[in-house]
Swiss-Prot record:
This is Lysine--tRNA ligase. Binds 3 Mg(2+) ions per subunit. SUPFAM superfamilies: Class II aaRS and biotin synthetases, Nucleic acid-binding proteins. Homodimer. The keyword Manganese does not apply.
Length: 505
């Protein structure tokens, strides 16, 4: 009977006894000398071995006489008398070890190896060969215990089933869940891919303050902290936008930042209070240039990471290979609520009546632009499955965006949606200092009227604009939501290594 079967079948393992037994084993190791050695060096990871040698026959491997050193966690063990098979897991995947009593120094097999536990971290040296079933394996001539695991692993066959436990103990999730490990490898590839894409287009990566005296750049409720040395209340940033545009004023014409934002808001399948954004600012460009850049970025990432421009998400196939759909906000409302009379969206009372008829509670502080935006979010947003740009956002909900030259009630702004979710937001930047000052005042009035997500007045930013911001376009993309799309994940907590959780009482 294999050891992993035995552990999987025993659903009521006495954890205290297990811990006691393992601690006793560790105590014996301490008595024998160094319990946690740090002198073993591997020369291959499992994926390197599989890539290089899976295609070779056993006869070729024997002729090559290749000796390798690997290290990792013992995930399974099948003891068959004088020989055993072990599955070793490392960062690259898994490799099988063949462990024979007579091929190891005297006493290692019976007195050491057989007393080790699943989850222990081992170092192994030996020669490559293939079993009769064709599995690449290592015939061990040296086997060492590098780290004694005091706690047992989750059931090999059922894994870490409790969803909350997966988030609280992400390390166990990563040990036992191939899909979870792959998700975070893809996340890393996305971040690297974005950086390479941006640098290739002449952008410079920068870092801006995470703690700010005035939170700005988005409509959101901030977290408050206190700086003891300055005896000053500060805010965790809700966006880096205003600092990045200060850099454009200073002459850095193409900048981007990938970093955390913090918003003191609810938690849901698509919202986490601490999340990662990429923001970029490009001088002498407008929002139409950003549309091209966004399409190219997603297409490039999909091709380079997944090897194709079609991405499976749930039961749909997202196509990044063709141009994204482009609709104005009003066109989207009409498309997904055909009975809408477009003229009603130009009248406050008519628009308010539409909003209330579909269950929207209209706040006293809302103007026509906010109402139309809320109608769009209610009737259209969930239907935007394929990549879609929505343009012509009202100026009322776009306090930092440049007004449209033809219709000053709207801005040269877009948001883009994939899978029924907003993924990013871009616009031609407002560089009229006087207009910006007035919009800040409008935001202050909204805050005084009860809108706790309205922006603060940022006098220093207005001063920066008074020195002259070139015609500029800016874009923000939610990295977490992007990773959700590329990994077919349906809750944001699956793509954040350590999501916000209520403490266990």
């Amino acid at each position: 009977m294999s050891e992993q079967h035995a552990q999987g079948a025993d659903a009521v393992v006495d954890l205290n006894n297990e811990l006691k037994t393992r601690r006793e084993k560790l105590a014996n190791l301490r008595e024998q000398g160094i319990a946690f050695p740090n002198d073993f060096r591997r020369d291959h990871t499992s994926d390197q071995l599989h890539t290089e040698f899976d295609g070779k026959e056993n006869e070729e491997l024997e002729a090559l006489n290749i000796e390798v050193a690997v290290a990792g966690r013992m995930m399974t063990r099948r003891i068959m008398g004088k020989a055993s098979f072990v599955t070793l897991q490392d960062v690259g995947g898994r490799i099988q070890l063949y462990v024979a009593r007579d091929d190891l120094p005297e006493g290692v097999y019976n007195e050491q190896f057989k007393k080790w536990d699943l989850g222990d971290i081992l170092g192994a040296k030996g020669k490559l060969f293939k079993t009769k079933t064709g599995e690449l394996s290592i015939h061990c001539t040296e086997l060492r215990l590098l780290t004694k695991a005091l706690r047992p692993l989750p059931d090999k066959f059922h894994g870490l089933q409790d969803q909350e436990a997966r988030y609280r103990q992400r390390y166990l999730d990563l040990i036992s869940n191939d899909e979870s490990r792959n998700t975070f490898k893809v996340r890393s590839q996305i971040l690297s891919g974005i950086r390479q894409f941006m640098v290739n287009r002449g952008f410079m990566e920068v870092e801006t303050p995470m703690m700010q005296v005035i939170p700005g750049g988005a409509a959101a409720r901030p977290f408050i902290t206190h700086h003891n040395a300055l005896d000053l209340d500060m805010y965790l940033r809700i966006a880096p936008e205003l600092y990045l545009k200060r850099l454009v004023v200073g002459g850095f014409e193409r900048v981007f930042e990938i970093n955390r934002n913090f918003r003191n808001e609810g938690i849901s399948v698509r919202h986490n209070p601490e999340f990662t954004m990429m923001e970029l600012y490009m001088a002498y460009a407008d929002y139409k240039d950003l549309i091209e850049l966004t399409e190219s970025l997603f297409r490039t990432l999909a091709q380079n990471i997944l090897g194709k421009t079609e991405v499976t998400y749930g039961d749909v196939t997202l196509d990044f290979g063709k141009p994204f759909e482009k609709l104005t906000m009003r066109e989207a409302i009409k498309k997904y609520r055909p009975e809408t009379d477009m003229a009603d969206l130009d009248n406050f009372d008519s628009a308010k009546a539409i909003a209330e008829s579909i269950g929207i509670h209209v706040e006293k502080s809302w103007g026509l632009g906010r109402i139309v935006t809320e109608i769009f979010e209610e009737v259209a947003e969930a239907h935007l499955i394929q990549p879609t740009f929505i343009t012509e956002y009202p100026a009322e909900v776009s306090p930092l965006a440049r007004r449209n030259d033809v219709n000053p009630e709207i801005t040269d702004r877009f948001e883009f949606f994939i899978g029924g979710r907003e993924i990013g937001n871009g616009f031609s930047e407002l560089n009229d200092a006087e207009d910006q000052a007035q919009r800040f005042l409008d935001q202050v009035a909204a805050k005084d009227a009860g809108d706790d997500e309205a922006m603060f007045y940022d006098e220093d930013y207005v001063t920066a604009l008074e020195h002259g911001l070139p015609p500029t376009a800016g874009l923000g993309i939610g990295i977490d939501r992007m990773v959700m799309l590329f990994t077919n994940s349906h809750t944001i907590r699956d793509v954040i290594l350590f999501p916000a959780m209520r403490p266990v009482k």
